[in-house]
Amino acid sequence: FLKVNLNGKRFCNESGPYEFMLHSMEMQPYHTYCDIFDANNKQYAEQFDEVGCCRLFPFPNGAASNMGYDYVWSKNEELIEAGYLQKANTLEELAEKLNIPVDNFVATVNRYNELCAAGVDEDYGKERHRLTPVDTAPFYGIRTGAWHLTTLNGCRINTDMQVLDTNGEPIEGLYATGDCTGGMFATTYPNLFTGLACGRTM
């Protein structure tokens, strides 16, 4: 969904790899952004064709999703009641609830909706099937930021999963697998193959 910074402006391709978007977020005011979506979010989420932990709907082959949409939305209702997720009947009202500049935000949404209608993201290059307008009330928004996920440090291992010492020699009786090992996510987070972290240890 659309993401805007605390100045009410879009700042990234929301469909890019986690780390690309989060590095962009890190450069924004207070390292914070707002996720924005509208009443059609269920329809849009289904057409996003997500994989892994983002998947909210069963796969075409019948495989279950990680968490179903209805379950996730029930949590959103709790967040609305708690005041974290904002719900509004107009874009102006949503901007005020998120405490971001109204004029900037409305202009950003209008520009984004134009790109969605054209089917081409001239600003950031998001794919056509993930260009979904924000034009149907009620509108929703939530402030959020980054988190640590699969950090780059860990135990260095050999092909037998033995942990190595500082000289590159195996430490007797010590083994490590999966995300506990170093270098697994040295360059990117491979969300296209959600079994990769565990599969490499089999």
Predicted regions located by residue number:
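A conserved FAD-binding loop/helix module that cradles the flavin
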Residues: 181-202
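A glycine-rich dinucleotide-binding beta-alpha-beta segment and adjacent secondary-structure elements
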Residues: 90, 104-188
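Composition- and surface-driven signal marking solvent-exposed, interaction-prone regions
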Residues: 16-17, 49, 107-108, 188-191
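An anion/pyrophosphate-binding glycine-rich loop and adjacent beta-alpha core
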Residues: 1-97
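Short, glycine- and charge-enriched coil/turn segments that flank and shape catalytic ligand pockets
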Residues: 96-99, 118
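Internal hydrophobic alpha-helix adjacent to the cofactor/substrate pocket in enzyme cavities
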Residues: 101, 106-109, 198-202
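Generic recognition of cysteine residues
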Residues: 12, 34, 53-54, 116, ...
